[in-house]
Amino acid sequence: INRLAVCLDPTPESIRIALSGGAEMILAHHPLTMEGRFTDRLDSYHEVLSLVFRADVPLYSAHTSLDANPLGPVSWLADELGLCRIPSSDTKDGEAGHGMPLPLTVLEQTGTMERGGGSYACGFGVVGDCAVDMTPEDLKKMLALWLVGSCPRLAGVLPERIRRIAICPGSGSSLAPEAAACGADLLITGDLKYHTALDLPLPVLDVGHFSLEEEMMRRFALQLKENVSDVAVQFVPAQDPLAPFSPTD
């Protein structure tokens, strides 16, 4: 493989752009389908399969394996906010004890990963402490730098001082109880549902599924460029399929 294209979703448009750029392999985050199905109708699923089969280009999805690696690009927003690991005494299970210390604390631990002769805890969502407590206005300003075009929705009331923040790109509202148990002041995620929002143990900021993971994949492409120097890596940007709509415009 000499040319690799990286994208969030394997949509027909993204696949066409990747192929027109000469991609010999396409790496997406989300799978083409979440469950097995037949190509029994002419839709986007059929179209993507036709495109990659005709071009003889493999399509690979790094989904939960990427989501669960706290040392990967999934932690990009935590890095930008300058979050650091919380004391082990504040976690539900104490210190993970898997060998390698992590810069952040994993929320929902699912196992371990091997790296450089050592192992470390992996799982979904991270939680960390701010170097300096933030006000809600401080947080707004920082998020505005990185979540351009996002229309966040807040469930709950933010405290006047925000010290500990949990983050889970994608759909992470199910982690709210564990984030609260770790003493988090806020959970940042996407895809928050109405009835879930009515019964949360801490404030949850829904910044959208797309905004966190699109930037995650852009940074993943940059990491691959740096670490796999003999492969030309192209990031294929996309647009949020959920566009803001104002009835007053």
Question: For the regions a protein language model found, what residue spans apply to each?
Answer:
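Active-site catalytic microenvironments in core metabolic enzymes, especially phosphate/sugar-handling
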Residues: I1-D249
